[in-house]
Design a protein with these regions (language model features):
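Phosphate-group recognition and catalysis centered on beta-loop-alpha active-site segments
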Residues: 1-248
Length: 248
């Protein structure tokens, strides 16, 4: 059901580094994390890049949106200065650059497909096609070296399924709705990814009994982490890579 690591560094390095950057992934690696979660969306010219927010202002200074900005211009923007002076000038990375870094350092990837509004199907398809090209030398049966896709956008996840059916998928839901099983079946999903705050032990048992894995976001308290693992949750991501170790 869940052949992957148990603890993932959220958006690269959690709170210790700017999210969705190579510096963040390096930070997670420095803390011993060989499993990372990050977000991917498309630039104006269709290049998959790491970014959570479709609009600038929080992690990238300025006005505008990722979907309206060329990749070359995104690379010139500061994606690290918001975090601390140490990371000022950190670039918005391409998905390809991060995949290559993760492969070189044996880091497992949970790739959250995060489409800007109106680009759901295109984002799912292009991220999947890009992944296939980057991992052309990896066997489709080699689960440890294939990423795990996930998305809140069912349209994006289905587009990824059609473009790259061999790459495993997880359905993201903020809470476990009545249609969770139908959604996972339609997506051909490996797991359900959900907010630990809206989850209970009975739901975990139901999902696991149906043959699916359970992944939670974003767990930053050790007592809560122990609790959900006792319930049978398979894995979770954390911002507190300084408190919750990779071998928790």
């Amino acid at each position: 059901m869940w052949p992957y690591p148990k603890v993932f560094a959220h958006r690269g390095g959690g709170i210790l580094a700017p999210e969705n950057t190579l510096a963040g992934v390096r930070c997670g690696l420095e803390y011993g994390f060989h499993a990372v979660e990050f977000d991917v969306m498309l630039s104006k010219d269709g290049v998959p890049v790491l970014m959570h927010d479709p609009e600038f202002g929080r992690t990238v200074k300025g006005q505008g949106s990722v979907a309206a900005t060329l990749f070359s211009d995104l690379q010139a923007m500061d994606a690290g200065g918001w975090h601390s002076a140490r990371f000022a000038g950190e670039a918005v990375p391409s998905y390809a650059a991060v995949v290559n870094f993760c492969r070189q350092n044996h880091i497992f990837m949970n790739v959250e497909i995060k489409p800007a509004p109106g680009f759901e199907e295109a984002t799912g398809r292009i991220v999947a096609e890009t992944t296939l090209a980057l991992l052309a030398d990896v066997s489709v049966t080699d689960e440890q070296h294939l990423p795990l896709f996930s998305s809140f956008s069912f349209a994006a996840l289905m587009a990824a399924k059609h473009a790259a059916p061999a790459i495993p998928r997880g359905v993201l839901m903020d809470s476990v709705g009545d249609d969770w099983k139908a959604r996972l079946q339609e997506a051909g999903a490996r797991a359900l990814h959900t907010n630990h705050r809206h989850l209970n032990d009975a739901q975990v048992a139901q999902i696991k009994d149906a043959g699916y894995g359970v992944f939670c976001y974003t767990v930053n308290d050790t007592e809560r982490a122990h609790e959900i693992l006792r319930w049978g949750v398979d894995a979770f991501c954390t911002d507190r890579i300084d408190l919750i170790p990779a071998d928790f």
